[in-house]
Amino acid sequence: MGQLYMQRFENWGAVSKGDFDQTWGVALQTFAKSGNWGGVEKGVRHIKTYGTSWGGYALIEVDDPAAFAHYQAHHYQNYGHVARVTFEPVSDMDAMFAATVEQLRSKSTR
């Protein structure tokens, strides 16, 4: 398994509807072609996109740093004028703490 990233896209407030719609058109074409928002054929796997009132998140898995660099560059070149885009590495804390939680549960039931 590669590194998980939570990608955040926050819409800029002063963007015209035309620019916003045109950019989403590019984004949807990119996704339809490659299966992800960054247009890479392999090395970045799209898991899920979540929308919010201000933009949203996309959860991705990265296996190839060069592909991730291309993925990021695509965002900055094509979407940066309508949204602030950031990428945060995330980890599965449920899995990380599972053994400790299980030990605590077993102690509390004695």
Please name every model-derived segment:
Residues 38-40, 78-81:
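Short, structurally constrained coil/turn elements
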Residues 1-55, 63-70, 91-110:
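Short S/T/G/P-rich N-terminal loop/turn motif that feeds into the first structured element of a domain
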Residues 79-92:
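Conserved short beta-strand edge segments in small beta-sheet-based binding/regulatory domains
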Residues 24, 75, 86-88:
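Short, charged/polar low-complexity linear motifs in solvent-exposed/disordered segments
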Residues 69-77:
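Short amphipathic alpha-helices in soluble, non-transmembrane regions
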